[in-house]
Amino acid sequence: MGEIMSNTPWKSDQWLTSQWNFAPEVTKEINFPEKIQIHDVTLRDGEQQTGVAFNYDDKIRIAEALAEAGIHRIEAGMPVVSHQDAKVVSDLAKRNLGPEIFSFARCMVDDVQRAVDAGVSGVVMEVPSSQHLIGLTQISLNLTTP
């Protein structure tokens, strides 16, 4: 990352943000950790917009740009979705761009295994929930309780 100028913490030789983010009335009750890490989901979540579909080369270029921007972790995709997603995730994990490469998976053995097989640093797992599912869980718990 670029060096931060002490009298102007809102800019460095690589980036600029609003100086108002550093105003005393804004920061007085904020206790920032020493290190903040950014986990970017563009390659997966970015495609969940109507009309947006990244091809293999798009995903590689986006990941390279994210790495160049200093992103710490990239959620590269969901290998179980398609062969292309599996290849992108695996290829990015092998390229050692700098950021850790994560995969996304449902809490299903096959999903998680495919993510692990892709060689990622970590797996983000989703557990779907709804009032209906929570209700079913409670009912099943009640049926098994003596």
Predicted regions span which residues?
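Acidic (Asp/Glu)-rich catalytic clusters
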Residues: 91-96, 112-124
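Hydrophobic faces of well-ordered beta-strands that scaffold small-molecule active sites
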Residues: 37-41, 72-76, 99-105, 121-125
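An N-cap/entry alpha-helix motif that binds or orients negatively charged groups
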Residues: 2-27
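Catalytic domains of carbohydrate-active enzymes, especially glycoside hydrolases
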Residues: 58-77, 114-122
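Active-site beta-loop-alpha junctions enriched in small/polar residues
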Residues: 41-44, 79-81, 104-108, 128-130
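N-terminal small/glycine-rich loop or linker at the start of catalytic domains
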Residues: 27-52, 124-138
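Glycine-rich, proline-tolerant flexible connector loops at the mouths of alpha/beta enzymes
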Residues: 51, 72-97, 127-141
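Metal-dependent enolase-superfamily TIM-barrel catalytic cores that perform enediolate-based chemistry
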Residues: 56, 60-62, 67, 136-146
